[in-house]
Amino acid sequence: MSDAAPAIPYAAEVRRKALHLGALVLPAGMLILGRPTAALILVPLAVLAVALDWARVRSAGARRVLHAVFSSLMRPEEVPPLGGPVVLNGATWMCVASALVAVLFPPGIAAAAMAMLMVGDGAAAVVGRRWGRTKWPGGLKSVEGTAAYAATAFAVGLAVVAWPGSGLTLGPCAAGAVAGALVEAAPIPLNDNVRVPVLSGLAMLAMLAL
């Protein structure tokens, strides 16, 4: 969902990715609050987000309110017709992913996985759509976008490495950044807001275990 063929205008894509940066409060909260408290907050938040996506295809009133605020940032495929199938938007997937990694991983890995996604995905989208020229074989994503993802994901991961008590070191941080970049570029059907942080977190966990 980074630098594939445009579905929304470039300016809207930039605004959409800026929201990802604002969502960095979620991984920061994982580090500050710890695993049990973060999960206790993020799991209900994910349930609420899914419920709102359900409501916008079942209730005309809910649909009007939600689309008045967020429609300019939604991709066409995220706007099903009233009465149609429930489709989760990018923000909902982000909430689901945050809850999932908060439950699955220690706080340092969970925070790094989500921060890498939020910063890396935005960088891949902006760089890939503006300067991406070299496409991966059989895919729509660009090598330039993937490189931007890996570099910025590693950079934000360093902030987690530096966080006292995070338990994350340079090697796992690099592994998570590279794994996330490659998984983001791969044409896998599962939404990248979920598959990327989970597989990135698994890569970091595996490196820490070595």
Name each model-derived stretch.
Residues P44-V47:
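Aromatic-rich transmembrane-lumenal/periplasmic boundary elements in polytopic membrane proteins
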Residues M1-L40, A51-V160, G167-L210:
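Interhelical loop and helix-boundary elements at the membrane-water interface
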